Amino acid sequence: MEKAKQVTWRLLAAGVCLLTVSSVARADSLDEQRSRYAQIKQAWDNRQMDVVEQMMPGLKDYPLYPYLEYRQITDDLMNQPAVTVTNFVRANPTLPPARTLQSRFVNELARREDWRGLLAFSPEKPGTTEAQCNYYYAKWNTGQSEEAWQGAKELWLTGKSQPNACDKLFSVWRASGKQDPLAYLERIRLAMKAGNTGLVTVLAGQMPADYQTIASAIISLANNPNTVLTFARTTGATDFTRQMAAVAFASVAWQDAENARLMIPSLAQAQQLNEDQIQELRDIVAWRLMGNDVTDEQAKWRDDAIMRSQSTSLIERRVRMALGTGDRRGLNTWLARLPMEAKEKDEWRYWQADLLLERGREAEAKEILHQLMQQRGFYPMVAAQRIGEEYELKIDKAPQNVDSALTQGPEMARVRELMYWNLDNTARSEWANLVKSKSKTEQAQLARYAFNNQWWDLSVQATIAGKLWDHLEERFPLAYNDLFKRYTSGKEIPQSYAMAIARQESAWNPKVKSPVGASGLMQIMPGTATHTVKMFSIPGYSSPGQLLDPETNINIGTSYLQYVYQQFGNNRIFSSAAYNAGPGRVRTWLGNSAGRIDAVAFVESIPFSETRGYVKNVLAYDAYYRYFMGDKPTLMSATEWGRRY
């Protein structure tokens, strides 16, 4: 009986309906379809397959029916004929799971060792690495060796470990004699650079017998980078050994910058480094000598190295160091060292104007600041506040009436239903495909359509995909306004500020989870949630899964933000940095600046690029939200602007 059901399912999915649909009542209204969809899912979860089989045919007109078909196919993928999967993929070319199914079925055909069938099913290279390895192995198995070796080489040259499915392909490539030993060296270099010591060791151990001397040296170096000088002196100087030595040297510098600094001349001599290669080593050490704990000799050496460097990011780090210590002479020196292209960035234009104001060249400074004010974001708002003028937001208006042709079609119908069922992440995949396929004008209309439907995260996503930076209403919707109003009431944090944090953290996706476990609108870590719930006696919280509920997340998130805000004297610069990087780091940065600098210099001197950008965004986003809530879009309060940091 069960086997007969499986056959029936496969034939249904292939488009050959063997069930008598007339015996099943078809749901006509959307509400009825939704009810039937919920019943089918419930029956499926309970493994009541006879109920599922009876009800499925009556739901073919429901937008999410392809998702049921997908589940039907993947539940029994091991027994599906290729025609079933092919028909499904062709019938649903824009369905996100259809693309993943294609790669999954390639792997299934490889499991069956149906190599000709695999190539017939997937004449083009599939999407995932595992499927590509199986695809090229199938090429070899069917006599298409040259294509197989080319694919093997592309898949081989990576610093990360590849799926087990790739082992067969790499083995036949190696056995064919077509794998150049230099490919081993190149992959070892990539693995070493990626810090994948285990892969380096495995690869070195697989090298041909006449490479065993270098292989042993590589294994020793990978396991103990501090032997880099021994490696440099005992291996012949080649491009490969120089690159390996440079990677190991970076590890040494990370642990002991002074040891690395003193090692440079010996390393340069042993590996016959040219001036550019020596400067690369100097740059590595200079990055590690940016703290307050360096000696005068180290500081002089560092600045000499940076003065000769061609690394824009390193010079910018030195500019920020000057800003953080209130070193005005150093600020002028290092700004001048920046290449012309870098000097055109908002931050460095502002600080050039700042130096001009200090020298009394007010007209030149104000010209730069007025030019900055024509842009959007943190520094344009800073420029306005610096010269005491109101910053004018430039807002592009999307059409209020969206072209009906854009809101029809299976993709939009699926998005509507996925949002109805609170399946935000799946909806985002559908939405991303839809938005990507449209013109910029159409993307603006889609952003407005999402906004009108209160699909806040999809509205934001459309503006990002279309680079619609001046569509501020769609970029910064007043999402969950009532909840934020309720949970900031009685707290010192402004509602606009809490919303700015949430917008920066999640772009209004309530279901988003970070790789480290931060969850929901305000990206709360489970440990932080537990601590905050206890501290504020918040009832009803029992598990991290609740953080994906908007109300629970906003309740806990605003409470934690209030706690951090109060810790730092109601200063949003500090509390924003602490929300992102932790209160301890903020206190360290404050200790380093020691009241010598202003607010803008403190923000720009934050050493972590992520936190620096985070604080700038949150302050700007707060200004946008205050504007949409009927207030002036001033970047900083008088207290934040006027104090020393």
Name the predicted role of every residue range.
Residues 20-25:
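N-terminal signal peptide c-region/cleavage motif recognized by signal peptidases
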Residues 2-13:
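Bacterial N-terminal signal peptides that target proteins for export
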Residues 42, 71, 75, 108, ...:
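Residue-level signature for tetratricopeptide repeat
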Residues 70, 269, 302, 307, ...:
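Catalytic glycan-binding domains that act on GlcNAc-containing polysaccharides
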Residues 28-36, 48, 60-67, 79, ...:
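Generic helix N-cap/helix-start motif at coil->alpha-helix transitions
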Residues 51-55, 81-91, 114-124, 146-158, ...:
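Alpha-helical repeat scaffolds
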Residues 46, 75, 79, 108, ...:
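Structural motif corresponding to the intra-repeat A-B loop/turn of tetratricopeptide repeats
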Residues 72-74, 86-90, 102-107, 282-293, ...:
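Alpha-helical adaptor scaffolds
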